[in-house]
């Protein structure tokens, strides 16, 4: 039976190896030290000392364990305790595209995930009056953020979750529904699909491969279904793609919560604005 001299509460060598590899650092050389450091770092000045001591004991005995971000950053000089951030696409302008890119990079550098609803961006091909050109549409912008997620990792080691959504009525929804249908997307003259190449090399670049995607369904969609009993072609295609590929997912936002279209990839938090974070 496994028994550790330095961390007697660990029941296997895997547990101790994981602790040593991911969470052990100066000032937190053992599990007990990490528990004390974490509670002092996060709770000092917020709860009475007796409660802090009780919390430390619960953690040492593994009756309560905080999220991995808290374990990793406890006592470090630059702590980033928040797991995910909600970012808002305000308007389809060069300034907003640039601002969203900056926000996304800033969050991803901390190892935090991001969630964005792109429904306010104009459909691809829309005329841009100021320049006479045409709009790229939301999907290329999703691709840009996806690329940021591919190359920007916190500490050079931790990838972050990315979430992107689009309203079911958006003019680009047909393209969005199949953007990750990789088996039906050929790559150049190779005769192979993105799906084929992904199976050969998991890290092969494919459309939105760093991003979880979902379709937003609002009150109008729900009321239409109640009146007609028909879910509509977008929903049926959504179901087909979800069954075939696992995505897009379904984001339901009805009535007083209709505008709460922002969420992180795991959906612990949903919101209308971008001031909310996930800190689980």
What does each model-identified segment do?
Residues 1-280:
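Extended catalytic cores of very large enzyme megasubunits
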